[in-house]
Structures are given as structure tokens and as C-alpha cells.
């Protein structure tokens, strides 16, 4: 049932990698909690930096955090001042040495998390949900996505009865494991309650070259 499972979890270990790359035995629950705390803190602290994902790698006595952002200048700051400040804050939070890498997202229009957050932000500002979704779909297709599906659920437009509305363009093959599907969710807080936003973006197929390296045909 490709439509009903999380497309990222469905492809983990096949075409997708884990967001946390480390191994632990007894301390695993504490480290998982620490990972969740780091992500929550970064999301709140860099609210205006278009954060798509945070990957965490652990080495003995050190945590390496990679921030995937559409606006690297906001994260790094003038002469790297912001990133140094952030490194100190995270070191204080974890009690360990922290390294921060910043990776720029070249095409934010085809990054599911940024698209979902953008739609949610527009819904919070009372912009028509149809206009917000259509605009996101058109931008993604224009920037090279092979397919996109967007859904919003809740009291859309302040309606008495909650419902789900969606738009789709191109193809989004959820059953195909080699399909490079980017999936994300976001929540819009409105005066009528919360509205959930889901975005699926099909970027191409993951194929292997003669050297055994994998790449997406959509890049």
C-alpha cells in the first residue's frame, strides 16, 4: 500500500539514508532524545532560515550537525558570527563538542519540507488555500520536478466541517522503490484551528552507474 505508508521510511536503506547516523547500546534512548531536542531547537532558533532537514552524526565526544537550508547566509551570518554563536549554544545544550556544517539547497521549490512550510505560512496569513497550493505546484514543476502532490486538511477557508483538498501534477509513483520521492508535512495554525499540509515531490529515479554509485535522474 504505497499510498498509505511514509515514503521516506518505506525507502530507508534502499534509496534513502537515515537522518541520524550513529550507533549506541544502553545510551540509545538518551541520544535519541538529544537528537530530537537538537532538531527542535534548531527549527525554532533558525525559524526564518528555510531549514529543510537536520542530519546528525556522532563521533566519540563530538556531535556533527549538518543543516540543510535554502538560506545559508542567515545560518552562517556575517563572517561566520552566527554559526559560531550557534555552535556554542548547541555545545551548552548537549555538553559535548559540536561541529556544524551548512549545506545549501539549490532549488528550494522542489524541496518538500520547504514547500510544505511555505504553504503552511501562507495559510496562517489567511491566503486562499487553493492559491497557495496551485502556486507551489506550478513553481515545483517549473523548477524541474517530474511530479508533485499537495494535500491540505482541516477547516479550510474557515468552513464548519473539516475536509481534505489536494492538487497533483505530473506523476508521483509511490509504489516504485527506486523513485526519488521527497515527502514532508507541516502545520498551519489559524484562528479556526490547525491545518495539516502534506507534500510529495517526485524528482526522478535513483539509478546506479558503472562504478556502483547511485544518483537521481532528476538532478
From Swiss-Prot:
SMART domains: KH. Signal peptide: none annotated. Gene3D superfamilies: 3.30.300.20, Ribosomal protein S3, C-terminal domain (3.30.1140.32). GO terms for biological process: translation. Disulfide bonds: none annotated. Keywords: Ribonucleoprotein, Ribosomal protein, RNA-binding, rRNA-binding. Residues 38-106 form the KH type-2 domain. Pfam families: KH_2, Ribosomal_S3_C. InterPro entries: KH_dom, KH_dom-like_a/b, KH_dom_type_2, KH_sf_prok-type, Ribosomal_S3_C_sf, Ribosomal_uS3_bac-typ, Ribosomal_uS3_C, Ribosomal_uS3_CS. Belongs to the universal ribosomal protein uS3 family. Part of the 30S ribosomal subunit. Forms a tight complex with proteins S10 and S14. Binds the lower part of the 30S subunit head. Binds mRNA in the 70S ribosome, positioning it for translation. This is Small ribosomal subunit protein uS3.
Amino acid at each position: 500500500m504505497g499510498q498509505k505508508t511514509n515514503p521516506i521510511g518505506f525507502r530507508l536503506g534502499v534509496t534513502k539514508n537515515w537522518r541520524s547516523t550513529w550507533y549506541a547500546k544502553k545510551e540509545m534512548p538518551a541520544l535519541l532524545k538529544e537528537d530530537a531536542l537538537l532538531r527542535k531547537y534548531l527549527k525554532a532558533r533558525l525559524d526564518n532560515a528555510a531549514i529543510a532537514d537536520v542530519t546528525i552524526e556522532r563521533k566519540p565526544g563530538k556531535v556533527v550537525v549538518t543543516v540543510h537550508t535554502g538560506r545559508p547566509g542567515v545560518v552562517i551570518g556575517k563572517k561566520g558570527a552566527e554559526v559560531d554563536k550557534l555552535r556554542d549554544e548547541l555545545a551548552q545544550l548537549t555538553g559535548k563538542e559540536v561541529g556544524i556544517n551548512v549545506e545549501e539547497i539549490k532549488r528550494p521549490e522542489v524541496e518538500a519540507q520547504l514547500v510544505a512550510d511555505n504553504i503552511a505560512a501562507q495559510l496562517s496569513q489567511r491566503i486562499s488555500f487553493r492559491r497557495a497550493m496551485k502556486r507551489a505546484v506550478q513553481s515545483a514543476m517549473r523548477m524541474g520536478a517530474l511530479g508533485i502532490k499537495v494535500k491540505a486538511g482541516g477547516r479550510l477557508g474557515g468552513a464548519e466541517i473539516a475536509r481534505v483538498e489536494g492538487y497533483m501534477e505530473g506523476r508521483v509513483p509511490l509504489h516504485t522503490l527506486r523513485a526519488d520521492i521527497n515527502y514532508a508535512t507541516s502545520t498551519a495554525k489559524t484562528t479556526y484551528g490547525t491545518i495539516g499540509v502534506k507534500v510529495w515531490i517526485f524528482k526522478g529515479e535513483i539509478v546506479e552507474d558503472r562504478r556502483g554509485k547511485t544518483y537521481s535522474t532528476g538532478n
